[in-house]
Amino acid sequence: RENNLSARVRSFIRGGVKDEEDALKGARDIIAEQVSEDERSRNQIRNQFSRQAIISSKVVKGKEEEAAKYKDYFDFSEPLKRCTSHRLLAIRRGESEGLLKVSISPNDEECTERLERSYVRGNNECSRQVQEAVRDAYKRLLKPSIETEFAALSKEKADEEAIRVFAGNLRQLLLAPPLGQKRVMGIDPGY
């Protein structure tokens, strides 16, 4: 089979394809694109993110003094599903100010193993090429895409929670008696 692969690859060497390695790289890129566009693959990775994603933040080198108000997040790591909304919003604020570097990531090895179980069959040169393509699909295409998706979703949930808390606090302020514990018989609106 491996000789067969080499012969098959040589048939694609023409035009912009210089050698066998170029042809194999092109084939791996095509496979990686197909894996990343497959809804089943995307759902597998989404499930991994929702179950075990970790949000991590680190201070940007050289900005330690400027980022002092974010010192709690200089070397921070926590499961995303347990990260409170105010903490997530603070981390994102530090990131948008260019003071923190933030990532959301599941266990990369477990994700690639799941994808490989879906796509890699056998143990030969062909399967090794497919395995390499699957790992590339995860690292270069799937992970960044799903990470962006989860960053947006988690920010949206945190924003909704912050609005809910703010609305509750505002309601309590508006419903509070205007003069505290003092009794009021009436208020003259013309005064």
Residue ranges of model-derived segments:
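Duplex nucleic acid-engaging cores and interfaces of nucleic-acid transaction enzymes
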Residues: 1-179, 183-185, 191
